[in-house]
Amino acid sequence: MTITKKLSRTEMAQRVAADIQEGAYVNLGIGAPTLVANYLGDKEVFLHSENGLLGMGPSPAPGEEDDDLINAGKQHVTLLTGGAFFHHADSFSMMRGGHLDIAVLGAFQVSVKGDLANWHTGAEGSIPAVGGAMDLATGARQVFVMMDHLTKTGESKLVPECTYPLTGIACVSRIYTDLAVLEVTPEGLKVVEICADIDFDELQKLSGVPLIK
């Protein structure tokens, strides 16, 4: 099967941003999820970073970076009017205490039940570093996953059961891939939108679990 059109990382970030509601408190995980900050437009959304920052704006313009203003992924960020800095422990209290509406995280695998594996593949010699992902997965009211649909070797990242170490159990609400948007339901993964030049049957063949129309 040849896919000639699928979402880029930027387009995936735009699609996630479209589903973030006005007034939401949101944590953007390290990596591709941080791109979402650039596509929120005029919506009033409060972006949180686990290193102790609330009220982040989009990425700074080239040449306007402030080395004292970075997110948890060590990327330069901007601060909106009214933004605040606070202790790392206070930041994790926000994460664990259910004060964040949405966490947008990357993933290696998501199971049909919404289990999340995003911090370690079990590869020999690799250094596991879960960071705050477990706190976000269990503490945020909703978890949006942003990931490629397939691995580099063509295997589905949607799986019946996660084979990598878990970050959270039944914590994922929505999955945004370069091919589709899926909702985690008690019955399974429901296709909300197909974002590539394939139909439902072709998407099903590429997915490691049964999908619901």
Swiss-Prot record:
InterPro entries found in the cross-reference section: 3-oxoacid_CoA-transf_B, CoA_trans_fam_I, CoA_transf_AS, NagB/RpiA_transferase-like
Catalytic activity of the protein: 3-oxoadipate + succinyl-CoA = 3-oxoadipyl-CoA + succinate
EC numbers, comma separated: 2.8.3.6
Keywords, in A-Z order: Aromatic hydrocarbons catabolism, Transferase
Protein family according to the UniProt entry: Belongs to the 3-oxoacid CoA-transferase subunit B family.
Quaternary data: Heterodimer.
Designated name of the protein: 3-oxoadipate CoA-transferase subunit B
Organism: Pseudomonas putida (strain ATCC 47054 / DSM 6125 / CFBP 8728 / NCIMB 11950 / KT2440)
Gene assigned in the entry: pcaJ
